[in-house]
Amino acid sequence: NIVGEMIDIRDNVVKSNSVNYQSLIGEFVHLNNSNTLIINGGRVTTEPKHNLVIRLDLDKKELCLSRPAFRKFLTEENNVTPKQWLFQMTQSGAKIVEKRKKMAANWKPGLDQFNVDAYILDTSTINKTILEVIDSELT
């Protein structure tokens, strides 16, 4: 009988901490605003002030997130697994690729030779308010 009650609670109680997976991108971008490189028209419009964690390429409609930094953000700060986040995002129609990326390309000579593991998101498939966190003029 106790097991039945537990199952009933699990199935019928509204979860108070349901996760908005798209908003996690916005939160990560907001936390790392000073770690963002923005490229527009092949030119740097915003340079990171600290470690390069995010690259936004407006012409290519790509938002690149450093995979190690984003995974740490998901697991340690939000208790969400990267696999769970990726699944939910693709279910919502977001196009995301996991691959190695030259995050510093077109920025500083020498640094652009190094690839890092990244999540590359097609910005035309994600909520536009995420980009507003970076710069309201981008949307």
Regions found by a protein language model. Give the residues of each.
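Extended alpha-helical interface modules used as scaffolds for assembling large macromolecular complexes
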Residues: 1-139
